[in-house]
From Swiss-Prot:
It comes from the Archaea. It comes from Methanothrix thermoacetophila (strain DSM 6194 / JCM 14653 / NBRC 101360 / PT). Belongs to the archaeal-type DHQ synthase family. This is 3-dehydroquinate synthase. It is an enzyme of class 1 (oxidoreductase). Catalyzes the oxidative deamination and cyclization of 2-amino-3,7-dideoxy-D-threo-hept-6-ulosonic acid (ADH) to yield 3-dehydroquinate (DHQ), which is fed into the canonical shikimic pathway of aromatic amino acid biosynthesis. Pfam families: DHQS.
Amino acid sequence: MKEKWLMALASEWDDVKPLITTALESGFDCVVVSRDHIELVRELGSIRIACFGRERGSEDLLIMDTSVPRENQIKSVEKIGRPIGGYVEIRSKEDELFATELGKHVDYLLVVGTDWKVIPLENMIAALQGYDCKIISCVRSSEEAEVALSTLEHGADGVLLDTRDPSEIKRVQAAAERLGMSRIDLKTATVVAVKPVGMGDRVCVDTCSLMRRGEGMLVGSQSRAFFLVQSEAEESPYVAARPFRVNAGAVHAYIRVGDKTRYLSELKSGDEVTIVDKDGMTRSAVVGRVKIERRPMILVEAEVDGERVSTLLQNAETIKLVSHDGTPISVAELKPGDKVLVHVETSARHFGMSIEETIIER
């Protein structure tokens, strides 16, 4: 997830308080403030605080003061030690080269351009790819934020918004969320078997987000094959809609989170999960609660590209897969020949990470 920072260096607290409050409400990750305001920020809420200075204070992250001569900055940051940030204004090629060298010695490199938009940022992103440094691009609008976050394939690691407009803070949050979405390839699988298998422990994942019809999570018994299990976004004659919930399946099952997998049984409050819709568009959500209960289970097997894949779900009419045309289909009505959406990967998994290895899972 891209980081969102707010520059809030006005000397008067009343000038920055509404901006910081909006940043907190919008899920920003860090605010850059004067040291006089550190404790006032902490009274508002929990957010990382960065300050400019020559030595550490009570802030969470020190950013090397720009008044330190450039020839001494790298020595100074090495003496102070990590975590530490650097700040460079890019006005020339010389500035770009200095920023790149400084980035090799800091955790965060804050860069602000004067008459440039993309090219120096591209150069720094490419030059610092092998270093443990996050590039934070200073911007003044959501339009500039979109450019910074999408530069090259990777984009900047985050943006530092310098604005006096609370509405711009919300627009940057929306832009970052939009750019954080990606598409995953979904295929159509043909159901070949549906079989009740008795009792088992199943996992309900209650998130802090509301899902729509056709949205859910990718779950499966194999680490490289996942069924799109829809959220409980629809009402039924038996129970009210719970659009924050995915009744995801048995405790042994894998769930795809980002580009990795986890066991359903491992999930807990505060974890991040990936929501996927019928078109393969993804977004992140936070787990609010996980419920594991003993319930009757049903085995669903399907074939895709000549391969058989499976998952175990609770045997209940409210549990739904997503059909090839995007409509939900209850496991209580599922039958051989039905078409459902799945995601299949070519590589196996080891500790949740994709690897090139021969693994047989049945």
